From Swiss-Prot:
GO biological processes: carotenoid biosynthetic process; farnesyl diphosphate biosynthetic process; geranyl diphosphate biosynthetic process; geranylgeranyl diphosphate biosynthetic process
GO cellular component, one term: chloroplast
Quaternary context: Monomer.
NCBIfam families listed in its UniProt record: FPPsyn (NF045485)
Cofactor(s) the protein requires to work: Mg(2+)
Family membership noted in the UniProt record: Belongs to the FPP/GGPP synthase family.
Tissue-level expression: Mainly expressed in roots.
Gene name in the database record: GGPP3
Name the UniProt record assigns to this protein: Geranylgeranyl pyrophosphate synthase 3, chloroplastic
MF (Gene Ontology): (2E,6E)-farnesyl diphosphate synthase activity; dimethylallyltranstransferase activity; geranylgeranyl diphosphate synthase activity; metal ion binding
Role summary: Catalyzes the trans-addition of the three molecules of IPP onto DMAPP to form geranylgeranyl pyrophosphate.
Protein species of origin: Arabidopsis thaliana (Mouse-ear cress)
Length: 360
């Protein structure tokens, strides 16, 4: 590992001041933030709260065709992303950007942004620039995460990673370019559609989600945690990593959806909590899949977290208890949607179930 981070920085980080008002202020306040304490997620009896067996994953909301909804939203997002990154000089970096950005993927984050915007009274067109911005940043983070100095991954979305095709130098530049493009795209395309004060808030929310109070913090602690003895690391430590590294961008996607749709402060907080729950859920399931599925099924290298000595939920609490945590988080996410129009909330209920039951 080329990057060395000392674990003492973890304790210093969580004691630091100056975080955003709505940020995760301490790994010990998980219950306050999401309604789920580390221990409460492990209290299901007799395995009854585990992830539903294959074939039953759609029972939570069988009347809503989430598969069709997801396909249609992904098509809309893909078309908007394609237009946002035309081929132009310098061609090599533009090709590298397009290679990763248009490589497919589930588009969970832009879908979340759009679904939330529609939930609070907005529409897809109003949310699309923010949805694309979130996906650009997500792709940027994947390009950088896959680098040899980070996770050293060879496959992403079933294809060779960006640095394997274009080289490490070009991959770094492509990731940087996507990060800058995200903010330019959201502000320029939304001009005239969203009030300036709301756009300023959206920019701040997104910036905080990916900086040292968000994604960067999670990645730093993740790197520092490699090869740690799981017996000496608590569940709160792992949740801190993933509330920042994974959930922070999902949280931003949801909050941006509310902002773009003209939602209220109360709606922002409810959907912020929903996103935190599905963010943790996404990572728990990701850890489970890493040790239960093949490389072909995942579209990325299976077992790489184990080989890298990373902290994961199965490593820390075991496979069965990880499944219990996942189901608990799914239910907690759905509870945040109570009080909304059920028909408009249906995509978000189905999204939580989809994340819990996905196979890649």
């Amino acid at each position: 590992m080329a990057t060395t981070v000392h674990l003492s920085s973890f304790s210093l980080f969580i004691q630091s001041r100056g975080r955003r008002d709505n940020s995760i202020s301490s790994v010990k306040s998980l219950k306050k933030r999401t309604g789920l304490s580390p221990s409460s997620a492990l209290t299901s009896q007799g395995g009854r709260d585990m992830i539903p067996p294959e074939g039953k994953c759609n029972d939570h909301n069988s009347a809503f065709d989430f598969k069709l909804y997801m396909i249609r939203k992904a098509e809309s997002v893909n078309a908007a992303l394609d237009v946002s990154v035309p081929l132009r000089e310098p061609l090599t970096v533009q090709e590298a950007v397009r290679y990763s950005l248009l490589a497919g993927g589930k588009r969970v984050r832009p879908l979340l942004c759009i679904a939330v915007c529609e939930l609070v009274g907005g529409d897809e067109a109003t949310a699309m620039s923010a949805a694309c911005a979130v996906e650009m940043i997500h792709t940027s983070s994947l390009i950088h995460d896959d680098l040899p100095c980070m996770d050293n991954a060879d496959l992403r979305r079933g294809k060779p990673t960006n640095h394997k095709v274009y080289g490490e130098d070009m991959a770094v530049l492509a990731g940087d370019a996507l990060l800058a493009l995200a903010f330019e795209h959201m502000t320029v395309v939304s001009s005239g559609l969203v009030a300036p004060e709301r756009m300023i808030r959206a920019v701040v929310e997104l910036a905080r989600a990916i900086g040292t109070t968000g994604l960067v913090a999670g990645q730093m602690i993740d790197l520092a945690s490699e090869r740690l003895n799981p017996d000496k690391v608590g569940l709160e430590h792992l949740e801190f990593i993933h509330l920042h590294k994974t959930a922070a961008l999902l949280e931003a996607a949801a909050v941006l959806g509310v902002i773009m749709g003209g939602g209220t402060e109360e709606e922002i907080e409810k959907l912020r909590k929903y996103a935190r729950c599905i963010g943790l859920l996404f990572q728990v399931v990701d850890d489970i899949l890493d040790v239960t599925k093949s490389t072909e099924e995942l579209g990325k290298t299976a077992g790489k977290d184990v080989m890298a000595g990373k902290l994961t939920y199965p490593r820390l609490i075991g496979l069965e208890r990880s499944k219990e945590v996942a189901e608990k988080l799914r239910r907690e996410a759905e509870e945040q949607l109570l009080g909304f129009d059920p028909s408009k909330a249906a995509p978000l209920v189905a999204l939580a179930s989809y994340i819990a039951c996905r196979h890649n």
